Structure formats: C-alpha cells, structure tokens
C-alpha cells in the first residue's frame, strides 16, 4: 500500500528542500563548502549555549517538572509581561501570554485555533514555509503579499491592501523577517 500526502499540502512548497537543496548537494560533491543555515540548528556552526546556561539546566534538572502549565511557565510569562510593561505597552496581562516549545509549535497551534475552512491569511513572500503549511493544514488559504528585495524586503503596503478580502482573517508580520532578515 502506498501512502500519499494530504491534498491539504498542494500549495505548500519549501524551495530549500527542493531544487536549491539539489544544487547545494551538487556543489558539495564538487568540493564546495556549503553552510546550510536553513536547518534552524545553530550548533553545527559553532553557536552553542553559554556555559552558564548549561550549568543552570544541569543544576535544575532534579527539581524539573514533567509538565508546565499549558500556557507556559508562570515566571517566564511574568517576565515577558513586565518587559512589555516597561516598554509602555498597554493591555498585556499574564493571562494573555502563551509560551511553547518553539515558534513552529506556536504557529501551528495559533492557525488551528484561529482559522475556519476558507479563511485567508496574508503571508509575506518570500515566506518561512511553515506559515503556508500551517494555514493550509488548518483549512485556511495562504495569500502571499510582496516583500520586494528592491525595497529592502519591506512589505508592499499597496499589495497587502489589494489582497484583503472579506475572507481575510489574519495578517502575518514578522520582525525580523524570516527568511529575508528585514527589520
């Protein structure tokens, strides 16, 4: 029996795992050194956790809880709330803050919680492919707006406005942008 992928992924494409990856492999075979910065794992490039962090983790292991509150650790949520209060951001309480095991988990959870079938989400292009996948899997329709290299990858406001419809449920803004790095 052959298992095929869901048709919900029909519009999902991750170029770095497609033609770009094949080209990178070919260059490696020719002897070129390729830094695969797309994998999201900084350790192979020498970016490791500071020793102080590692020691804190080791020291706290004996008292670590199996599960935290479903919204995340209270102390971390409180620190985030206090940070934004110091920045004079109003209306953020500790109950408004949710933490997860990384941005990927939070993207998927937020799209599942927010979208009904057919809802549209405006996503920057080029995009971090998980956004398109998460929207599609949640039954939504990804609609890409332009972030033009000639404009330092900033979002094109006219393009965004032109793509807003009665079905638009959300607008994704990422700062700094992934994958362009625009701030």
Region roles according to the model:
Residues 23, 110, 159-163:
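CheY-like receiver
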Residues 40-44, 128, 177-179:
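Short, solvent-exposed loop/turn segments at secondary-structure junctions
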Residues 91-97, 117-120, 167:
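Short acidic capping loops at alpha-helix termini that bridge into adjacent secondary structure
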Residues 136-143:
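A short helix-loop-beta submotif of the ANL/AMP-binding
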Residues 3, 10-102, 109:
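N-terminal small-domain helix-loop-helix segment of the aminotransferase-like
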Residues 113-135:
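Conserved PLP-anchoring active-site segment centered on the Schiff-base-forming lysine
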Residues 143, 148-183:
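Active-site phosphate-binding strand-loop segment of PLP-dependent enzymes
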């Amino acid at each position: 029996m052959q298992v095929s992928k869901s048709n919900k992924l029909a519009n999902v494409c991750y170029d770095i795992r497609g033609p770009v990856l094949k080209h990178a492999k070919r260059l490696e075979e020719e002897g070129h050194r390729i830094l695969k910065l797309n994998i999201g794992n900084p350790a192979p490039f020498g970016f490791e956790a500071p020793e102080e962090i590692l020691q804190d983790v080791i020291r706290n292991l004996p008292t670590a809880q199996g599960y935290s509150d479903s919204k995340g650790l209270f102390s971390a949520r409180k620190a985030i709330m206090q940070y934004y209060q110091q920045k004079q951001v109003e209306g953020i309480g500790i109950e408004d803050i949710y933490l997860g095991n990384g941005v990927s988990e939070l993207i998927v959870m937020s799209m599942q919680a927010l979208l009904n079938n057919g809802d549209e989400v405006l996503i920057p292009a080029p995009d971090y492919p998980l956004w398109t996948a998460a929207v599609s899997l949640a039954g939504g329709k990804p609609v890409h707006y332009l972030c033009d290299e000639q404009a330092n990858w900033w979002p094109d406001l006219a393009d965004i406005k032109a793509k807003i419809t009665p079905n638009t449920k959300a607008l994704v803004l990422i700062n700094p942008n992934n994958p362009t790095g625009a701030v």
